């Protein structure tokens, strides 16, 4: 009798413990970027984690895996497959999962961060990310600034597209970036990020392109003599979530997570723009010859590169998608500048 009662009590406690465990949600979040821990993106992620855990009264725990589960491509794949619950990724890899997302890599799509922010929060972007969710099971919670990309090299100042001719330039492993470099007359060499510094040090390539914050944080300035702030492509970060997992959460928890993701975006946006200016000045002080390209020079780069990349992306994502992206970017520009 006693043994029966003991077993019954143990079973009751186990069930109660199970119910308590089910009440608390543990979410796995990973970052596939190489940003410094004090970078705007990283500060935004910390703000998001703290907000979600505080607002849920500890019922949601966010476990951070920082650069331990691969780069953006790997963490995006993990979110798609459900190995990760959510993650920060960048728009340059999403074209591998949903081809229309390649269209955001068009050179000189945005004249400023303010226009890009307007675009990211606009109706068209909501439609694009919703289409991606339906096609892939990857839900987008928020978009934020990754930054404008600039050119560095070890051979000469780059003021116009003609200065690019003959340079061997490292690119991401992306056909869009290869098309961009080739349109300027440079020899594009796709190299994985971990091998970039060795390639620059040994002159396998003459230069590379990246956000100023990356050039500073990764110490690329130590092996490059020249930098051109030509802001040729704007990079976006996205907080993505496995759609099935998100739908399994309570409405209250969904709302808190969405709010946290938006807090990340607002925090990152305000910090990223400042960080880029500070990094550029630090690079100059470190001895690199920095040229800030004029609007006239940027227009030369746009004319030389944009159509070639647009034509390539149209073969991948469709001309109608490219036309819609260009129209939405123009709409965002008018919303900011009023003309």
Can you annotate each of these PLM segments?
Residues 22-115, 124, 130-339:
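N-terminal secretory/targeting leader peptides
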């Amino acid at each position: 009798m006693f043994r029966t009662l003991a077993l019954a009590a143990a079973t009751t406690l186990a069930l109660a413990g199970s119910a308590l465990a089910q009440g608390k949600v543990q979410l796995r979040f990973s970052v596939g970027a190489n940003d410094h821990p004090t970078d705007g993106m990283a500060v935004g992620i910390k703000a998001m984690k703290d907000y979600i855990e505080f607002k849920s009264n500890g019922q949601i725990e966010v476990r951070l895996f920082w650069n331990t589960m691969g780069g953006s491509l790997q963490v995006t794949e993990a979110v798609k497959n459900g190995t990760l619950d959510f993650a920060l990724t960048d728009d340059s890899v999403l074209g591998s999962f949903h081809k229309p997302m390649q269209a955001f890599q068009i050179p000189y799509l945005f004249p400023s961060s303010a226009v890009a922010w307007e675009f990211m929060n606009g109706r068209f972007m909501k439609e694009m990310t919703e289409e991606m969710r339906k096609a892939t099971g990857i839900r987008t919670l928020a978009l934020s600034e990754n930054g404008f990309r600039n050119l560095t090299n070890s051979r000469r100042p780059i003021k116009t597209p003609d200065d690019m001719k003959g340079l061997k330039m490292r690119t991401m492993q992306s056909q869009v970036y290869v098309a961009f470099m080739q349109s300027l007359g440079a020899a594009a060499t796709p190299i994985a990020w971990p091998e970039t510094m060795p390639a620059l040090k040994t002159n396998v390539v003459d230069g590379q392109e990246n956000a100023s914050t990356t050039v500073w944080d990764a110490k690329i300035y130590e092996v490059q003599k020249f930098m051109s702030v030509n802001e040729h492509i704007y990079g976006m970060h996205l907080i993505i979530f496995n759609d099935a997992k998100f739908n399994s959460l309570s409405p209250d928890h969904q709302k808190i997570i969405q709010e946290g993701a938006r807090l990340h975006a607002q925090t990152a946006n305000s910090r990223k723009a400042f960080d880029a200016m500070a990094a550029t000045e630090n690079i100059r002080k470190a001895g690199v010859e920095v040229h800030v390209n004029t609007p006239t020079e940027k227009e030369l780069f746009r004319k030389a590169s944009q159509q070639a990349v647009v034509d390539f992306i149209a073969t991948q994502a469709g001309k109608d998608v490219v036309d819609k992206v260009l129209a939405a970017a123009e709409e965002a520009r008018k919303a900011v500048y009023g003309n």
